[in-house]
């Protein structure tokens, strides 16, 4: 059916689920990937960005002429830049200088100003700089995705109900939900709501083996962009997940490449990591169950990285 909408915000959500075929393990639960690159700016973060802006407007924190400032690893910033452009706000996004060229250029394409901070400072450095800018710029507002309850709320309101409707259509019980974690918004909001709807499911959070902060380890370098900011975000509900799955850069990269070459699904490395974890989770469940895995963004944002250096 042809979809005609009033603005880009109406295109956020209702992303499709696609079944794994060639990567599907035998005698295991069926894995479905929820393709968040179908959102208008290409990632799951469109959901949180829109919800944070709407709630800020409702609470009088954003008014005509306001400036949105946000520390971001990229996807939330892109979602905020898109929504800011559509709603008439200026956006300033602060990010580590290790982020991909594609992300930086996308932000600029949406009319946003980009401020880069030293990569070795990771997200805490970008957060500090964003707060400094907010003190200097009048009528500015930091949504602060790591603290903002609108972030998980977006997934309670949209992502989880979408998955529930899909499970009803598939006709098999949901056995597990798998997602990576950056801010914690997706795993918290979706996980909480799905456990209310499907009390018997397990929730599995993915983090990079090189920066196992959720597992109690120290932050470190890794290639799963958008995950493990180097600290445990305040909005993350650590009780919602039943298992933390640590994924190596190598396994994430291999799975990401296989998804493109064998399934025709081009996603980013954090999605490859989540898919690897979903496949391993599915092997522990019976074939009459379903595993839903969130894929955070499009792989087009990573074509300049070593993920695709062999091309």
From Swiss-Prot:
InterPro entries hit by this protein: Cys_synth, Cys_Synth/Cystath_Beta-Synth, CysK, P-phosphate_BS, TrpB-like_PALP, TrpB-like_PALP_sf
Coiled coil spans: none
Example GO biological process: cysteine biosynthetic process from serine
Cofactor(s) it depends on: pyridoxal 5'-phosphate
Top EC group: transferase
Catalytic activity: O-acetyl-L-serine + hydrogen sulfide = L-cysteine + acetate
PANTHER family linked to this entry: CYSTATHIONINE BETA-SYNTHASE
Similarity annotation: Belongs to the cysteine synthase/cystathionine beta-synthase family.
Protein name listed in UniProt: Probable cysteine synthase
Protein's organism: Bacillus subtilis (strain 168)
Gene: ytkP
């Amino acid at each position: 059916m042809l979809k005609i909408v009033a603005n880009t915000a109406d295109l956020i959500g209702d992303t499709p689920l696609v079944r794994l075929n060639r990567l599907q393990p035998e005698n295991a639960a069926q894995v479905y990937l929820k393709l968040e690159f179908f959102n208008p700016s290409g990632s799951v973060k469109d959901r949180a960005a829109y919800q944070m802006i709407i709630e800020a407007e409702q609470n009088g924190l954003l008014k005509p002429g306001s400036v949105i400032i946000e520390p971001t690893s990229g996807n939330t910033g892109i979602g905020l830049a898109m929504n800011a452009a559509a709603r008439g706000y200026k956006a300033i996004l602060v990010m580590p200088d290790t982020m991909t060229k594609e992300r930086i250029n996308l932000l600029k394409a949406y009319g946003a100003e980009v401020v880069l901070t030293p990569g070795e400072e990771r997200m805490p450095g970008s957060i500090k700089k964003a707060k400094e800018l907010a003190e200097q710029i009048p009528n500015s507002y930091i949504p602060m995705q790591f603290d903002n309850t609108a972030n998980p709320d977006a997934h309670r309101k949209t992502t989880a109900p979408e998955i529930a409707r899909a499970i009803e259509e598939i006709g098999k019980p949901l056995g597990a939900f798998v997602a990576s974690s950056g801010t914690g918004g997706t795993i918290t909001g979706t996980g909480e709501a799905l456990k209310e709807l499907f009390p018997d499911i397990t929730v599995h959070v993915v983090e990079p083996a090189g920066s196992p902060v959720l597992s109690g380890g120290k932050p470190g370098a890794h290639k799963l962009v958008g995950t493990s900011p180097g600290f445990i975000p305040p909005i993350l509900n650590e009780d919602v997940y039943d298992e933390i799955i640590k994924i190596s850069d190598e396994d994430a990269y291999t799975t990401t490449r296989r998804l493109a070459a064998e399934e025709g699904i081009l996603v980013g490395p954090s999605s490859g990591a989540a898919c690897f974890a979903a496949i391993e989770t599915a092997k522990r469940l019976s074939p009459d169950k379903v595993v839903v895995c969130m894929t955070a963004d499009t792989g087009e944002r990573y074509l300049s990285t070593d993920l695709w250096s062999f091309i």
